[in-house]
């Protein structure tokens, strides 16, 4: 065995024995560093005769290249092994229970929870979910819903308007979710049964009002629906949502441009204590507004009011959340206070009483 072969064998054994990047780098320096074994032999080429140099040069350079290649392969192997070790130490078992510290566990916001409860109740009764844009046109927000230009009912809405755009149109933030009723009626054929939860915007702010609030509206359009059906629907919803066996309701005459007749619905309750109790007591609390869809609204979407009829209603999601779960100030809903959310929020698997197997 020649000196070159013996040197290559020694270096290869040292590379194989290196078990971390620091040891591997030491082998490289010992072989190819400024005073390394291969570097010293390469320096000696200058002292050789030309004939000897022509023979030894390619051999030494070949050795250098082979050692560099083996070193790079071992370096990559050690890096992969180090990464595998790190990943195995940092693996998170997603089947483990969540941490118990209040600041480390997430909570579902009451608004999100109540929206899910509302959707669950109405979909169980055959309704589908509809959605629409928050930024609306004057036509969908007012005109199509029987609010003509200059109509005094427009004063009921303190509206956020945008600047007039390039085509002369002035967009606005929707003041109710009713525009989705028009958009749905334009696209779908009757019969229609939809609910529309979403954000709405009005210039109002106090303990019970917010410039942005959540509303759910519903719409039923067919050839046979009556006020009796509407009254049954509201009674059923209130019993399910407030989790009571029975409720007393009263329907008071009111006015909404898009319904005729229009009504406001009160639910009987007990307000004598620190919280509102439904299904008992002698007090009354307004819960929603409703009515039969106005013939002008039906005509605006191409339906014959002599053939089709239906009813619509709307209620504030924030308001009924406050009533059901005893939250006194609406403004706290939007303060991003984790302490408030930890107190009033819901765990991921919390379910209301009207769901079967709620404790599973």
Curated annotation (Swiss-Prot):
Residues annotated as binding Mg(2+): 260
A Gene Ontology BP annotation from the UniProt entry: phenylalanyl-tRNA aminoacylation
Q: Which cofactor does it need?
A: Mg(2+)
- Source domain of life: Bacteria
Q: What subcellular locations does the record give?
A: Cytoplasm
| Reactions this protein catalyses | tRNA(Phe) + L-phenylalanine + ATP = L-phenylalanyl-tRNA(Phe) + AMP + diphosphate + H(+)
Keyword Protein transport part of the UniProt annotation: no
Query: What are the entry keywords?
Result: Aminoacyl-tRNA synthetase, ATP-binding, Cytoplasm, Ligase, Magnesium, Metal-binding, Nucleotide-binding, Protein biosynthesis
Q: Which PROSITE patterns match?
A: AA_TRNA_LIGASE_II
User: What does the entry's cofactor note say about binding and number?
Assistant: Binds 2 magnesium ions per tetramer.
Q: Does the keyword Lyase apply?
A: no
Pfam family example for this protein?
A: Phe_tRNA-synt_N
Using the UniProt record, name the top-level EC class of this enzyme in a single word.
Answer: ligase
Gene3D superfamilies reported for this sequence: Bira Bifunctional Protein, Domain 2
The EC designation for this entry is 6.1.1.20
Entry's InterPro entries? Answer: aa-tRNA-synth_II, aa-tRNA-synth_II/BPL/LPL, Phe-tRNA-synth_IIc_asu, Phe-tRNA_ligase_II_N, Phe_tRNA_ligase_alpha1_bac, Phenylalanyl-tRNA_Synthase, tRNA-bd_arm
Any one GO MF term held by the record is: ATP binding
What's one GO-annotated cellular component?
cytoplasm
Instruction: Kindly state the subunit structure of this protein.
Output: Tetramer of two alpha and two beta subunits.
Family membership noted in the UniProt record = Belongs to the class-II aminoacyl-tRNA synthetase family. Phe-tRNA synthetase alpha subunit type 1 subfamily.
- Would you tell me the protein name for this molecule? Phenylalanine--tRNA ligase alpha subunit
- Chain's gene name: pheS
């Amino acid at each position: 065995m020649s000196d070159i072969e013996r040197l290559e064998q020694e270096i290869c054994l040292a590379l194989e024995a290196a078990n971390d990047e620091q040891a591997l780098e030491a082998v490289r320096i010992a072989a190819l560093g400024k005073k390394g074994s291969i570097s010293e032999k390469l320096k000696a080429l200058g002292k050789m005769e030309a004939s000897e140099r022509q023979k030894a040069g390619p051999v030494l350079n070949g050795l250098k290249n082979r050692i560099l290649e083996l070193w790079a392969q071992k370096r990559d192997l050690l890096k992969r092994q180090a990464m595998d070790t790190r990943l195995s130490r940092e693996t998170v078992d997603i089947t483990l229970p969540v941490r118990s510290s209040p600041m480390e566990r997430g909570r579902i916001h009451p608004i999100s929870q109540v929206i899910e409860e509302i959707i669950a109740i109405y979909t169980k009764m055959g309704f589908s979910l509809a959605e629409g844009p928050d930024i609306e046109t004057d036509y969908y927000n007012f005109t199509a819903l029987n609010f003509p230009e200059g109509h005094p009912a427009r004063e009921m809405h303190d509206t956020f308007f945008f600047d007039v755009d390039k085509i002369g149109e002035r967009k606005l933030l929707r003041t109710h979710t009713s525009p989705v009723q028009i958009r749905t009626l334009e696209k779908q054929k009757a019969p229609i049964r939809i609910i529309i939860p979403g954000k709405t915007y009005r210039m109002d702010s106090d303990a019970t009002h917010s410039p942005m609030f959540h509303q759910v509206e519903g719409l039923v359009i067919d050839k046979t629906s009556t006020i009796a059906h509407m009254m049954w629907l509201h009674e059923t919803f209130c019993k399910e949502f407030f989790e009571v066996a029975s409720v007393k309701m009263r329907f008071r005459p009111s006015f909404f441009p898009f319904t005729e007749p229009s009504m406001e619905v009160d639910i009987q309750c007990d307000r004598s204590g620190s919280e509102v109790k439904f299904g008992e007591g002698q007090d009354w609390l307004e819960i929603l507004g409703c009515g039969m869809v106005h013939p002008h609204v039906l005509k605006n979407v191409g339906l014959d009011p002599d053939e089709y009829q239906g009813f619509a209603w709307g209620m504030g999601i924030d308001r009924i959340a406050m009533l059901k779960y005893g939250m006194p100030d609406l403004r706290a809903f939007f303060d991003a206070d984790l302490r408030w959310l930890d107190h009033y929020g819901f765990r991921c698997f919390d379910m209301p009483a009207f769901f079967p197997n709620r404790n599973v």
